[in-house]
């Protein structure tokens, strides 16, 4: 191939480089031969890569995947120089003076051949068909544009085509050194060898990641969208992944703002990890947690998506790698993003620099940094939560649960990162799972050089287990089994054992112990402000002071013996006492919650099945906090005689035969009031309760009066107290309402309490309550809840006290009458306001728009109300305004109801006017026929047959009989036919009966 086309190629090169000597031409020849050899090497490497891929390829993969991979391998030939060529170059290469210069295989491998062949410009029918179908070629082109994953093959591919901006074997530019081609070939071999060794390592470790080959999925990588990244973040169950992550490629260093930082980093210019941390923090604004997670060359975290084509996809530019937790300070400029585009530093340089870092000092810096951030966030959250209504906290819980959980876990377990990083990939999940990988050649050296006392950073001394009540042991109360003494005695007993944990056997034993204990641990508790909203499937306990645990287990750099003892105690939880576990629902609504006390919130917080609140007695919480940490999840059995005391509400709901009295639920009134069954129990008891029983539970109700008023079940308890409570209790509850009438009136459940209060409280308190609505009357009228309060004010209060409400309706009667809620208010005004002047003003506005309101979906109710409940002259005036439009109104959906009301409540004369208009003035009775066939008019005709007198009935029946057969063919006419036949039968009987009676009375 080289010898056949060498002369022509050399002539082309000579034409480009006129004036070059023979030595230069010989050098070009050698370079061309080396490039062709490199091309053949790439072909063989591509075949080897395909064989590797076939091992992991699914048996159901489509047959075109192999061709697609081949096309993607060929994309390395496309470079920026493709912009300077066009498809016509193929023709010049293929045919020059009628002589074919390239073989069929060479043509097929040409980078422009596919686009030329599948375009409409080629005119040579003898061109060999390409190896790739048109569909596969299009897919390859599309995926080539989005391919941006670093791997040994991809990096070699880039460097192959970037030699002096050359993008094709057939467009070689002069000046390419032979040494560069040899270096590329050696780099390729090294990359392949390194990729194989990495794959063998991953297989030994039982991993499924395919490092180094981004196209294993068959479709190559695709750029993640924001939705993908967000979804993966929500699905992750740990703040730290099961593996430490690393940058997707060396290109992740490119965006570093200060090149001097990287130069010092690469050269080992930092004398201490503090200097290294400060420099990175000032440059990239990133915490050490993200820095370590981004720079350690641990495996890429496993992708959890079930889609096979997503296995090899990479993170988008500007986002940290998946598995790296981003803190608040890092969100806009993370270190993972800042180092994404560096080209000058290799992984070996980074690893060499990191190996010189003091990991214990770095972990301490990281812990201090994260704790300072958490302190600020906790203070901010504390301020916010004090002013958030109880109703809004439930939504806030859903927004902050995952984020707060991951962030706090990252901070609390931050001390483990030093040890975990030194081992390579030792991590701790948010569920307490400790993953320590198998010992490898790299970890062996770290074992031999690291200080084994750093094992303490993996233990519980550096973990905030405020709610992680170990094995149900109560660390915060004086009663029960005191684990402090037990831990101290065990610590003395095993203190000599710490020096024996340095051997390989003991390390393996410790690893096994850690993994066993990890299965027993649960996720650490979140910020106390949010802990009451987290309903996990596992049992939880009350918070524990972190300082108590630190005092027993030592500092963050505690010795190995204490950590070993902590894990030993967690594993052997049965030795700490014979404790019975309640089900998980019991802990979702404890009688007492230290988290709520710490919160300082005066409102009870909801749970799944019932409500809990914070003013329960300490004696009840002491026993509850002693339930084993592991718990018996899903069990409904509760041993009342044990140290765990069952909830009174749960016992009441589970035991239907048990009878309780109000005096027995003292201390649990709020919990009962906010439960469906408990609220119903209190309501029933209040109806027949004595004053003593009411006074026994009312002191618990009063402090949470406004909270219960807006609760779905608690509002009924407040209403019952307004209805059946003593005068003093009603007054005190009314004082709770003062200043909040408008807000409660606009609330779904609060509006019911306001209505009940307006019915029973004294007039003076009624006046004060209604006065708070001044200036917001129209807002309440247009509200689905507030309109009921306005109606109650109109019904219950004297007109002098609510004149500000009535006067706000003047000039707006038509608009209010056509409003879904305003029409109800206008009806109450017409019904309860007796003032003549007020009635006149309202009726004038209504009479001016009778026909409009009669046809409106809401206004027709106002007209019907006047016809049914209004004065006779008002009804006659409305019928007169409708006269002449009866047939039209009868065929309208809403106005037909008004016509029926006129026939029902109108006088005989008014009714006769309507009947005459329906019959018409001809013998054909066209209006009557049209009404009988109409979906709405037929009901008006039926109402006429029900309400008219005998004379009118006989006349109408005689007219209908003529059209009876025709009506049977119409859907709505059938109703008339059935009604007429029934009336005819009834009428004939009535006529016959009348005739017989007349004959008997004749002498």
Curated annotation (Swiss-Prot):
Sequence-specific RNA-binding protein that regulates translation and mRNA stability by binding the 3'-UTR of target mRNAs. Binds the APUM-binding elements (APBEs) in the 3'-UTR mRNA sequence of CLV1, PNH, WUS and FAS2. Pumilio repeats lie at residues 664-699, 700-735, 736-771, 772-807, 808-843, 845-880, 881-916, 917-958. This is Pumilio homolog 4. One of its GO terms (biological process) is regulation of translation. One of its GO terms (cellular component) is cytoplasm. It comes from Arabidopsis thaliana. The modification Phosphoserine is found at residue 225. Residues 644-984 form the PUM-HD domain.
